[in-house]
């Protein structure tokens, strides 16, 4: 028989750096989940992605056990890494902070495809380009139609 799901918790934690301090401790502790056990499992599974911010969805059950799924880093974080800037523009429509190519957009879109709600790489590229635009990061050139 399947376990009874008590709820979901969504967090963004740096890979290999989960610890019982906020935001992890209070979020899990209030639900009765073993914080140290989660931290050990998360850190073990994310050692290869150390330092990158990773979204994690924790499913906890009525018997206080849990499972979790680690997603790919957010598009905004990947865009900042590719553009080599620390933050987006305060005025994205007026002031651009960086410029990236469509090839870089394609790479991010292919990496993020599993988490996005789209069926084609082109649709994912448009989503990534929209995020870049809202952050003040310009995309060089025209959208590649036949690629």
UniProtKB/Swiss-Prot annotation:
Q: Which GO terms describe its biological process?
A: translation
Describe the PTM: One or more lysine residues are methylated.
The UniProt entry's GO CC annotations, sorted and at most eight, read: cytosolic large ribosomal subunit
Annotated GO molecular function terms are: large ribosomal subunit rRNA binding; structural constituent of ribosome
Q: Which organism is it from?
A: Bacteroides fragilis (strain ATCC 25285 / DSM 2151 / CCUG 4856 / JCM 11019 / LMG 10263 / NCTC 9343 / Onslow / VPI 2553 / EN-2)
Entry similarity comment: Belongs to the universal ribosomal protein uL11 family.
Pfam families in the record: Ribosomal_L11, Ribosomal_L11_N
Tell me, how does this one assemble?
Part of the ribosomal stalk of the 50S ribosomal subunit. Interacts with L10 and the large rRNA to form the base of the stalk. L10 forms an elongated spine to which L12 dimers bind in a sequential fashion forming a multimeric L10(L12)X complex.
| PROSITE patterns assigned to the protein according to its UniProt record, in alphabetical order | RIBOSOMAL_L11
Q: Provide the protein name.
A: Large ribosomal subunit protein uL11
What the protein does comes down to: Forms part of the ribosomal stalk which helps the ribosome interact with GTP-bound translation factors.
Xref: NCBIfam families: L11_bact
Kindly indicate whether the keyword Ribosomal protein belongs to this entry: yes
């Amino acid at each position: 028989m399947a376990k009874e799901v008590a709820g979901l918790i969504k967090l963004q934690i740096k890979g290999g750096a989960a610890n019982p301090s906020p935001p992890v401790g209070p979020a899990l502790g209030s639900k009765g989940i073993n914080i140290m056990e989660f931290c050990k499992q998360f850190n073990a599974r994310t050692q290869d992605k150390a330092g990158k911010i990773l979204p994690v969805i924790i499913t906890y059950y009525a018997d206080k056990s849990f499972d979790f799924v680690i997603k790919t880093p957010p598009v905004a974080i990947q865009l900042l890494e590719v553009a080599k800037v620390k933050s987006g523009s305060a005025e994205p429509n007026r002031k651009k902070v960086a410029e990236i190519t469509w090839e870089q957009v394609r790479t991010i879109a292919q990496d993020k495809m599993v988490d996005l709600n789209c069926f084609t790489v082109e649709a994912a590229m448009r989503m990534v380009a929209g995020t870049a635009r809202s952050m003040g990061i310009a995309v060089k050139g025209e959208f590649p139609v036949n690629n």
